[in-house]
């Protein structure tokens, strides 16, 4: 199980690197899917099933739609591939930043921040992420609606920014 969790963590980091150093929007979608599946699998292996399911639906249901619209509106006739030197340079730079962060984090990692587990150290019979469902639908409904409208506004802003002056792949008939 330990090797599986380490493998999911490695896939999550590689997916994040793929999104950050994507040569074109076509390949950014692949990195996003890899990172979201690995991250949600990681949370699922830690026992946080509800949060994992919600994040999986948000990432693949919301962000993937924005990527699809971006790809359809910004068709690139000659997309860069993963092997181009500019993309490899970005990837190497991100790996260097990651290694420096791990080295610096190793010195800070000895501090105790008081993190508790999902069942609050066995104190409750109901896990904390399942009790969050009731709070989400009772007290958090207003913020949920505000977040939905914000995501819709973000979708239109991204569509307008991607379209620009050239109208992308959609042409006037």
From Swiss-Prot:
Keywords: Electron transport, Membrane, Mitochondrion, NAD, Respiratory chain, Translocase, Transmembrane, Transmembrane helix, Transport, Ubiquinone. GO terms for molecular function: NADH dehydrogenase (ubiquinone) activity. Its main location: mitochondrion. Signal peptide: none annotated. It comes from the Eukaryota. The chain crosses the membrane at residues 1-21, 27-47, 48-68, 87-107, 139-159. It holds the Pfam family Oxidored_q3. One of its GO terms (cellular component) is mitochondrial membrane. It catalyses: a ubiquinone + NADH + 5 H(+)(in) = a ubiquinol + NAD(+) + 4 H(+)(out). It is found in: Mitochondrion membrane. Its EC number is 7.1.1.2. It is a multi-pass membrane protein. PANTHER family: NADH UBIQUINONE OXIDOREDUCTASE SUBUNIT ND6, NADH-UBIQUINONE OXIDOREDUCTASE CHAIN 6. Core subunit of the mitochondrial membrane respiratory chain NADH dehydrogenase (Complex I) that is believed to belong to the minimal assembly required for catalysis. Complex I functions in the transfer of electrons from NADH to the respiratory chain. The immediate electron acceptor for the enzyme is believed to be ubiquinone. Belongs to the complex I subunit 6 family. This is NADH-ubiquinone oxidoreductase chain 6.
């Amino acid at each position: 199980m330990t090797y599986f969790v380490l493998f999911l963590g490695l896939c999550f980091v590689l997916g994040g690197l793929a999104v950050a150093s994507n040569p074109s929007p076509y390949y950014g979608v692949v990195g996003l899917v890899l990172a979201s599946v690995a991250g949600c699998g990681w949370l699922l292996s830690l026992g946080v099933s509800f949060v994992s399911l919600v994040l999986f639906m948000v990432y693949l249901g919301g962000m993937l739609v924005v990527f699809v619209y971006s790809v359809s509106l910004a068709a690139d006739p000659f997309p860069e591939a993963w092997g181009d030197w500019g993309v490899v340079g970005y990837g190497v730079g991100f790996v260097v930043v990651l290694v420096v962060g791990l080295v610096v984090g190793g010195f800070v990692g000895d501090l105790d921040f008081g993190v508790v587990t999902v069942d609050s150290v066995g104190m409750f019979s109901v896990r904390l992420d399942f009790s969050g469902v009731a709070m989400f639908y009772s007290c958090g409904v207003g913020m949920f609606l505000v977040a939905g409208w914000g995501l819709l506004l973000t979708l239109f802003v991204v569509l307008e920014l991607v379209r620009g002056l050239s109208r992308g792949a959609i042409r006037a008939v």
